């Protein structure tokens, strides 16, 4: 269970359920909207219950970055309070001298979740890359390009993120803070949570052409 904060918006609570086959992301309720990532297919299904629609996002190739990107990590020697018996450390992840992530991560915590999130982020990067053609140049900042396309899983290289501030806008603007609230392991999730409803399906490319 996570909570996300963005400027001028109410905090949003998120639930992630991870199995060897799937990653499901929702608001903590079993009905309604949810995102399902099929790990074997590397395909994302965005389910919109109110529209009875499923948007299908298949993996796509990521081409070269439009500008040079230089990544750097600045670790902090100080330790934060441990989580789940795992040491938490502080890092700043930079691209072209801009701070893109201010990160507290627990190395060795929930490794199966870290792996699933890495797969999901890398699969989603292809769609973000395709969307560059429709993104204003001023929004294609080094952090936006790095975080979403060219280094989409770098914040997972240090363990599970306990808290992270993400900046993608110019001069560190558009900050989103994500924090871990709670977690549990070893339970049997209802298989119905990983079944897609009989809704109309449309690919993200078809949706964009509308």
Q: Residues of each region from the PLM?
A:
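Extended soluble regions of mature proteins
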Residues: 1-210
